[in-house]
Amino acid sequence: MHDAVTRPTPPADATAWPRRITQAVKIGSVTVGGGHPVVVQSMTNTDTADIAGSVKQVADLWRAGSEMVRLTVNNAESAAAIPRIVDKLRMMGIEVPLIGDFHYNGHQLLAAEPACAEALAKYRINPGNVGFGKKKDLQFGQLIEFAIKYGKPVRIGANWGSLDQSLAAQLMDENSQRDTPWDAGRVLREALIRSAVDSAERAVELGLPRERIILSAKVSGVQELIAVYRDMASRCDFALHLGLTEAGIGSKGIVASAAALSVLLQEGIGDTIRISLTPEPGQSRTQEVVVAQELLQTTGQRAFTPMVTACPGCGRTTSEFFQELAGVVQNHVRAKMPEWKITNPGAENMTLAVMGCVVNGPGESRHANIGISLPGTGEAPSAPVFIDGEKSVTLRGENIAYEFIELIDQYVERTYVRRAG
């Protein structure tokens, strides 16, 4: 096995641990690991054979900020659709790397559809169901041969819902011989890690370069995920994909993902993430991308859009106007960010504050690049605006929202040097 990587010493100041040093994996135009920024990825839930529907959803996820998108490739129709999906996306000016998600029959599909093998930017392989019994090594080897032939990276992703049962049984037998047997949870974690890491080392033996391998070992429990990735990170130098295998629906899924991934990211573990949310009825699939971006931004890993701080409101606030203004401001900067990213680089680092009364309003506003403190109960009907810590102007009347948005736009043009063109 490759030399293990030692966990870094925690910093004494208010920063994350140094990023774990890993292999850098090139996936289309995106680089994962090797000190590069943590990459946001997502997955479609369309029938991949539905080319129009899949193209639309990939485009939506890409526009929301997904830097890689995974699609199910589970039958001949979906495999045949992949090249056409890539072509249609390119016609739209979208060059997002597409990842093929293979289970059970990937070796057959790639053999039958060479154009699919060529069009995909990465293959996801599950060592728990790539093959069973004597066929396992053969079929795993065939998938790796395709990756080598077409120059593609792979993610070897173990999952506790489809764990290699022969390996699990072997480790259970070994555990029964210990003087002090491990509990079942520890044996399960060991099986997940061994499944991923041993499969990766086997891929290297077959000729796949280390810099074309990403690993994951997913579970649904927060503490289990943290334990698995801490252990796996100490055993190898492969880039790691983070995510709960099924985070859940609504706020539960968001909280669970944030609880697990923020700990690992704080410790420098993780090179690409996916938030596996179950969309609520009528909710956009793009929410998982927004949550992933907000998680990385709030933990200081990356900046995607200006962050808006707003107070929750209390008995001191006279209306919901400050809450409405906070929403208007957040929507405005998110809508402007694609333009600012090109013309005003650095605007994504801007901080904004929309506060509802005099208690914390002026102080919080001074901490932001631009902040506004709206009047609370019994306060004068005026709203001082602070820019870079200094009081700039006081807004009054019916046009406070419009005037504050205008101040934000002016600040961006003045502070973040506009690129020509």
Swiss-Prot record:
Enzymatic class: oxidoreductase
Gene Ontology biological process: isopentenyl diphosphate biosynthetic process, methylerythritol 4-phosphate pathway; terpenoid biosynthetic process
Key words, A-Z: 4Fe-4S, Iron, Iron-sulfur, Isoprene biosynthesis, Metal-binding, Oxidoreductase
Claim: Oxidoreductase is one of the keywords in the record: yes
GO molecular function: 4 iron, 4 sulfur cluster binding; 4-hydroxy-3-methylbut-2-en-1-yl diphosphate synthase activity (ferredoxin); 4-hydroxy-3-methylbut-2-enyl-diphosphate synthase activity (flavodoxin); iron ion binding
EC id: 1.17.7.3
Pathway: Isoprenoid biosynthesis; isopentenyl diphosphate biosynthesis via DXP pathway; isopentenyl diphosphate from 1-deoxy-D-xylulose 5-phosphate: step 5/6
InterPro entries recorded: Dihydropteroate_synth-like_sf, IspG_bac, IspG_bac-typ, NO2/SO3_Rdtase_4Fe4S_sf
Binding residue positions for [4Fe-4S] cluster: 311, 314, 357, 364
UniProt cofactor(s): [4Fe-4S] cluster
Entry's cofactor comment: Binds 1 [4Fe-4S] cluster.
Entry similarity comment: Belongs to the IspG family.
Gene: ispG
Role of this protein: Converts 2C-methyl-D-erythritol 2,4-cyclodiphosphate (ME-2,4cPP) into 1-hydroxy-2-methyl-2-(E)-butenyl 4-diphosphate.
Catalyzed reactions: (2E)-4-hydroxy-3-methylbut-2-enyl diphosphate + oxidized [flavodoxin] + H2O + 2 H(+) = 2-C-methyl-D-erythritol 2,4-cyclic diphosphate + reduced [flavodoxin]
Record's protein name: 4-hydroxy-3-methylbut-2-en-1-yl diphosphate synthase (flavodoxin)
Keyword Metal-binding listed: yes
